[in-house]
């Protein structure tokens, strides 16, 4: 059986040169193609191994790869980034066979790069690191399209020193994330170390090295069985759904197995479950040699064999979501079985596992899956996760979740817009909607918001609790003996406020009515303050209390437990000591 080319996705932080790197790689296949050798794809670029061999030239021999590579070439996904990789999903793993993690060699691994790395690792996809922007290394002498191994031999010592320092920092960053890596020509065990290839998407330096390292990694880590294309109806994944003038709703899909034919029935999925559609037309780009008119770039074909990127024109594609599985069926009796398989697959993504947690919404099945995975890794519980914009039901679910934990009253919306009526309902219900197109920024905003909510919630709870306090009646400062007793006191620890109950030796003596300092009423007195207090109750100075007595603020048992076991960090040291003394006095009684 035929062997297909591995699918390759390019990932990394914003502005690291992902798109430019892809353009440079695509350029090699065009420049070094042979007539009729280049097959055009929808959403993918094919780089044949023969073109790589011609482009890389002596480096192929230097690395002893000539005649050893059995893959036909590489199929690069045209759209770089997190979303494309997320949508390349299938049951049990990823449609992507290889990934290139692009890092800016001058600044190292950044937030989105870390997120991309974790996503790649979660799917178990072999990857190579392209340390890009080599041309910006101080003192580096660039020559167009030169292999890195050749270029590095032509550099001054200060350029090499700067390069080594940058790679060393990157290796250290990766090590802290549990990834052992090194410059690719120093890697001795590719099973243990991730290769780093210095590249320049501007000059093309290191591109040859990158393609050869990709080839080596693919041969080492991708089982031949995974790349073997089996006969029969196609299997694939939907990458994009859009409306095309004159064609209606079309789906751009990647086929990783089998053959898709005009007239086939395809089973895929929308927000509300599996969808069945009949293929009316299959569209592919014309070969490069035949592209005379930019407006006439596509042609209709009768069938498409995996691996391929194809545009499907079919009745019934409305509402299909990117990242959905795609199964072709030719026997009408097998349609229901395919519907069942697709339904089971998408139900694994649409999760409602935690009793309490946040609500998650994403634009595609793939991004939903990766969003949920990322949030789970960060310890964020999820009550509900689904594809599509937030709904009325989501707001209701968030309100219910908030009752258990105010920080769960939120909808995290990745790459989806919120309908105005839902936005209005959420606002009136006190439900927060956090939306964005970059996952780690949504997470950061959620963490910031949840901390604010937690702080506000704790402040509200603490404002209703009695803070511990300890006072001493000052000798010579009895202004009134009873009804109410008015005495001068010094606050020895903690805080006293009007309304608190005072106790002596575990027995209640009365309630503080008013506190005055320098003849004026105040709302509270803290440790060190000397104030006058009026005490209402069955108390008389000279009987129940005397000059020099130490009194404690009465803290109810339940609140005392809360202070000690839930909110201890919110007590000052003197307040904690006063609480412990109060409890000890109560036990003695």
Swiss-Prot record:
Binding site for GTP: 12-19, 78-82, 132-135
A GO molecular-function annotation: GTP binding
Segments for region (G3): 78-81
Entries under InterPro entries matching the protein: EFTU-type, P-loop_NTPase, Small_GTP-bd, T_Tr_GTP-bd_dom, TF_aIF-2_arc, TIF_IF2, TIF_IF2_dom3, TIF_IF2_dom3_sf
Stretches the record annotates as G5: 200-202
Domain tr-type G as annotated: residue spans: 3-224
Chain spans, region G4: 132-135
Keywords: GTP-binding, Initiation factor, Nucleotide-binding, Protein biosynthesis
Positions of region (G1): 12-19
GO cellular component, one term: cytoplasm
Region (G2): 37-41
Function noted in UniProt: Function in general translation initiation by promoting the binding of the formylmethionine-tRNA to ribosomes. Seems to function along with eIF-2.
Similarity-based family: Belongs to the TRAFAC class translation factor GTPase superfamily. Classic translation factor GTPase family. IF-2 subfamily.
Protein name, as recorded: Probable translation initiation factor IF-2
Organism classification: Archaea, Thermoproteota, Thermoprotei, Thermoproteales, Thermoproteaceae
């Amino acid at each position: 059986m035929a062997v297909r080319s591995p699918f390759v996705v390019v990932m990394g932080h914003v502005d690291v040169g992902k798109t430019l790197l892809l353009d440079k790689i695509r350029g090699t296949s065009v420049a070094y193609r042979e007539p009729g050798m280049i097959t055009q794809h929808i959403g993918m670029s094919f780089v044949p191994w023969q073109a790589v061999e011609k482009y890389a030239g002596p480096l192929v021999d230097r690395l002893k790869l000539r005649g050893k590579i059995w893959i036909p070439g590489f199929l690069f996904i045209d759209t770089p980034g997190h979303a494309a990789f997320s949508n390349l999903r299938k049951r049990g793993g990823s449609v992507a066979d290889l990934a290139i993690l692009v890092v800016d060699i001058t600044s190292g691994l950044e937030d989105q790069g870390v997120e991309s790395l974790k996503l790649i690792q979660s799917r178990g996809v072999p990857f190579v690191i392209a340390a890009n922007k080599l041309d910006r290394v101080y003192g580096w002498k660039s020559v167009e399209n030169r292999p890195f191994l050749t270029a590095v031999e032509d550099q001054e010592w200060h350029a090499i020193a700067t390069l080594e320092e940058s790679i060393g920092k990157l290796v250290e960053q990766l090590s802290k994330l549990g990834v052992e890596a090194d410059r690719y020509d120093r890697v001795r065990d590719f099973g243990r170390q991730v290769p780093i290839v210095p590249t320049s998407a501007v000059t093309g330096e290191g591109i040859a090295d990158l393609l050869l390292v990709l080839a080596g990694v693919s041969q080492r880590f991708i089982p031949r069985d995974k790349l073997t294309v089996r006969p029969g109806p196609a299997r694939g994944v939907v990458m994009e759904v859009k409306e095309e003038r004159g064609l209606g709703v079309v789906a751009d899909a990647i086929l990783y197995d089998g053959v898709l034919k005009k007239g086939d029935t395809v089973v895929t999925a929308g927000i509300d479950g599996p969808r069945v559609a009949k293929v009316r037309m299959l569209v592919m780009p014309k070969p490069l040699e035949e592209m005379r008119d930019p407006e006439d770039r596509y042609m209709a074909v009768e069938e498409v064999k995996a691996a391929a990127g194809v545009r499907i024109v079919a009745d019934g594609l409305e509402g299909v979501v990117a990242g959905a599985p795609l199964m072709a069926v030719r026997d009408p009796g097998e349609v229901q079985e395919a519907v069942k398989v697709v339904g089971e697959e998408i139900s694994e993504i649409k999760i409602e596992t935690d009793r309490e947690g946040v609500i998650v919404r994403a634009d595609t099945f793939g991004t939903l899956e990766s969003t949920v995975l990322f949030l789970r890794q960060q310890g964020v519980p999820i009550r509900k996760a689904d594809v599509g914009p937030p709904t009325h039901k989501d707001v209701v679910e968030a309100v219910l979740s908030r009752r258990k934990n105010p920080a769960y009253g939120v909808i995290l919306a990745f790459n989806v817009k919120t309908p105005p009526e839902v936005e209005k309902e959420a606002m009136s219900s006190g439900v927060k909607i956090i939306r964005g197109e970059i996952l780690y920024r949504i997470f950061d905003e959620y963490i910031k918001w949840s901390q604010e909510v937690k702080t506000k919630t704790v402040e509200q709870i603490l404002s209703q609790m009695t803070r511990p306090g300890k006072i001493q009646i000052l000798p010579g400062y009895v202004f009134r003996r009873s009804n109410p007793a008015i005495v001068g006191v010094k606050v020895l620890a903690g805080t006293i406020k009007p309304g608190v109950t005072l106790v002596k030796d575990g027995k209640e003596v009365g309630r503080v009515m008013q506190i005055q300092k320098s003849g004026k009423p105040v709302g509270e007195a803290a440790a060190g303050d000397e104030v006058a207090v009026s005490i209402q109750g069955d108390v008389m100075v000279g009987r129940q209390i005397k000059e020099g007595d130490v009194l404690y603020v009465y803290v109810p048992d339940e609140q005392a437990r809360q202070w000690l076991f839930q909110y201890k960090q919110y007590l000052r040291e003197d307040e904690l000591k006063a609480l412990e003394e109060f409890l000890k006095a109560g036990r003695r009684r």
